[in-house]
Swiss-Prot record:
Catalyzes the prenylation of para-hydroxybenzoate (PHB) with an all-trans polyprenyl group. Mediates the second step in the final reaction sequence of ubiquinone-8 (UQ-8) biosynthesis, which is the condensation of the polyisoprenoid side chain with PHB, generating the first membrane-bound Q intermediate 3-octaprenyl-4-hydroxybenzoate. The gene is ubiA. Keywords: Cell inner membrane, Cell membrane, Magnesium, Membrane, Transferase, Transmembrane, Transmembrane helix, Ubiquinone biosynthesis. GO terms for biological process: ubiquinone biosynthetic process. It is found in: Cell inner membrane. It is an enzyme of class 2 (transferase). Belongs to the UbiA prenyltransferase family. Pathway: Cofactor biosynthesis; ubiquinone biosynthesis. This is 4-hydroxybenzoate octaprenyltransferase. Its EC number is 2.5.1.39. It catalyses: all-trans-octaprenyl diphosphate + 4-hydroxybenzoate = 4-hydroxy-3-(all-trans-octaprenyl)benzoate + diphosphate. The lineage of its organism: Bacteria, Pseudomonadati, Pseudomonadota, Gammaproteobacteria, Pasteurellales. PROSITE patterns: UBIA. It is a multi-pass membrane protein. Its cofactor is Mg(2+).
Length: 286
């Protein structure tokens, strides 16, 4: 079977999670927040297109390297047992090359930006590469994911104003807290399997306090987003819509209350609407 056979292309698409766009959206929203907040207006179409394409490529690359890192354990977890590397529909060598191609394409995009952003992109690649391996060594892999998913924020500021002001880092921390919260919800789905095979996560670390800590992280997210709005001198419409966005967190807390797998997964998916609503808040506020 050639690497371009139909079955292989389908497997590569699944490695890149083309059939599951939620991760791309969760990475896209904070990127858009940062681009619009840095400019206090709509960014140029070229910069916007570069970042949207970059989000897609780097999220895809992250999924590929994640499956490569987990290739020996995915088959032992119900949710991931049918992934291409677990079933043999793609090989580890193919996954490595796919990761390299995706990162290379991302780098070509970054070369269209300024040197400031090119330098920041090196950190983005390092974070994307190391995150999948952290679940073997620490119960805090979600924090590494938060850093990886949030690094588009300083890159967005770098690409537009070539500076990283305080509000950039406050937005980064807000996104970090949000990412840890929603990825803990995601990890709660696999907690029983992860305990059995020895994989670490914040869902395991937080144990019976998981819902309380998720709620705390969500409160921190909102506090920092309010702070960003204040420092960026956004108008009152931003704060009103942001308060509405907070209602999604209340709904998620109700979903995860009983720790049912399906409900935890639905809470995770609901974060897309939170990200979208915050973006609307930014649009109304600038």
């Amino acid at each position: 079977m050639t690497i371009f056979a139909k079955d292989k292309l389908i497997a590569y698409g699944q490695l890149m999670r083309l059939d599951k766009p939620i991760g791309t959206l969760l990475l896209l929203w904070p990127t858009l927040w940062a681009l619009y907040l840095a400019e206090k207006a709509m960014p140029t179409l070229s910069v916007l297109a570069i970042f949207i394409c970059g989000v897609f490529l780097m999220r895809s690359a992250g999924c590929v390297i994640n499956d490569y890192a987990d290739r020996h354990i995915d088959g032992k977890v119900k949710r991931t047992s049918l992934r291409p590397l677990s079933t043999g529909r793609a090989t580890p060598r193919e996954a490595k090359w796919l990761f390299i191609v995706l990162v290379f394409c991302s780098f070509l995009l970054v070369l269209c930006l300024n040197l400031y952003t090119i330098g920041l992109s090196v950190i983005a690649v390092i974070l994307a590469f190391i995150y999948p391996f952290m679940k073997r060594y620490t119960h805090l892999p979600q924090f590494f994911l938060g850093a990886a998913f949030g690094w588009s924020i300083p890159m967005a500021y770098g690409a537009t104003i070539e500076a990283l002001p305080l509000e950039c880092w406050l937005l980064f921390i807000a996104n970090l807290s949000w990412t840890v919260a929603y990825d803990t919800q995601y990890a709660m789905v696999d907690r029983d399997d992860d305990l059995r095979i020895g994989v670490k996560s914040t869902a395991i670390l937080f144990a019976q306090y998981d819902n309380k800590i998720i709620a705390l992280l969500q409160i921190i997210t909102l506090i920092f987003l309010f702070s960003v709005g204040y420092l960026s001198q956004l108008n009152n419409r931003y704060f009103i819509v942001l308060a509405i966005a907070g209602l999604f967190f209340v709904y998620q807390c109700r979903l995860t209350k009983n720790r049912d797998r399906a409900s935890c997964f639905n809470a995770f998916l609901n974060n897309n609407y939170f990200g979208l609503t915050v973006f609307i808040a930014v649009l109304f506020g600038i």
